[in-house]
Structure formats: C-alpha cells, structure tokens
From Swiss-Prot:
It is an enzyme of class 2 (transferase). InterPro entries: Cyt_trans-like (IPR004821), NMN_Atrans_arc (IPR006418), Rossmann-like_a/b/a_fold (IPR014729). It catalyses: beta-nicotinamide D-ribonucleotide + ATP + H(+) = diphosphate + NAD(+). Keywords: ATP-binding, Cytoplasm, NAD, Nucleotide-binding, Nucleotidyltransferase, Pyridine nucleotide biosynthesis, Transferase. The keyword Cytoplasm applies. It comes from Methanococcus vannielii (strain ATCC 35089 / DSM 1224 / JCM 13029 / OCM 148 / SB). GO terms for biological process: NAD biosynthetic process. Belongs to the archaeal NMN adenylyltransferase family. It is found in: Cytoplasm. One of its GO terms (cellular component) is cytoplasm. Its EC number is 2.7.7.1. Transmembrane segments: none annotated. This is Nicotinamide-nucleotide adenylyltransferase. One of its GO terms (molecular function) is ATP binding.
C-alpha cells in the first residue's frame, strides 16, 4: 500500500519525523508532498522546496522508509487540486492529513483519509520553531540534527532575520 501526506515542512521537525515513521509502519511507501512548494523567502515560508527536500531526505536517511518527495504547487482551485496531485504523484490508496480542507477534497474523490496523531504539537510546531529562530532562542532540539545542518548550510536563520527587517519605506 502507498500513502500520501502533504505538508509545508517549514522546517521539517521531530513531530513531522514521528508522523512519517508511524505512517511507515502502516504502508509500504509514502509519498511526501512538499505543499505550497512555490512559496519561499517569507516569514511563514522561509525555505524553498529544494531546501525542504534536503531537510526531509537527510532526516529520513537513517531510517528504512520507502518514500518519494514530490513538490506540490498551490493552485487556488480546490475543486481540481486532487487531480493536480494525482498527475504529479505515483498512485496511492490512502491520504494522511490533519487539514480539514485536504481531508474533504480527498474524501470527495473516495480516498481513504486518515488523520495522523500529532506528536507533541505544542512543542513541535513550525511556527514556534521559526519564532525561536527569529528571537535567537534555542531551536535546534526541535528538529532532527540533519535539519539543523541544512538550515546552517543555507544560512536559514540569517534569512529569517533579514526577512523580518523593516525598511525605511515601511515608516513613511
């Protein structure tokens, strides 16, 4: 059996890792969708699709998990989004999502949809991790060490801080 899960993975953290590991116990292969792949260089989506692929690939490297990583664009046309996903991915039977819209769209197309159990959601939140990065607080223990390496390699902290800078034009 092959399953699909989509997320923004901004950044890929230990909560995401636990969900992927749990799904891998239930299916033979996982298709990991890089959602909103066209978005990057913003405070909510600071990392590119390629950087997120690096994070996930390196973090999963030590596990015996069969997976594909597929970038998925936002198309702002919900009625055809599932068809778009289907055209980009290998066939799959099951969708794992905690997102109510994604759940509804795939359910309407008769997919088996499961809601993964979130792993310590208060602690493992991309939003909170990005806030810690911005404030100069400790964030490294929330993500796999391979993700720390990628973020340091691409100067992800510097990028987030630069994105938060205010230009003089903002004050006039």
């Amino acid at each position: 059996m092959r399953a699909f899960i989509v997320g923004r993975w901004q950044p890929f953290h230990k909560g995401h890792l636990e969900i992927i590991k749990k799904i891998s116990e239930e299916v033979d292969e996982i298709i990991i969708g890089i959602g909103s792949c066209q978005r990057s260089h913003t405070l909510t989506d600071p990392f590119t699709a390629g950087e997120r692929i690096m994070m996930i690939t390196k973090a999963l490297g030590r596990y015996n998990i069969n997976y594909y990583i597929i970038p998925i664009n936002d198309i702002d046309f919900n009625a055809v989004w599932v068809s778009c996903v289907e055209s980009l991915t290998p066939p799959f039977d099951t969708v794992y999502t905690g997102n109510s819209l994604v759940r509804e769209l795939f359910s309407e197309k008769n997919y088996v949809v499961k809601k993964p159990e979130l792993y310590n959601r208060k602690e493992y939140s991309g939003t909170e991790i990005r806030k810690k990065m911005l404030k100069g607080e400790k964030w490294e223990h929330f993500v796999p060490e391979e993700v720390v390496d990628v973020i340091l390699e691409i100067d992800g902290i510097g990028r987030i801080k630069r994105l938060d800078e205010k230009d003089y034009d903002d004050y006039f």
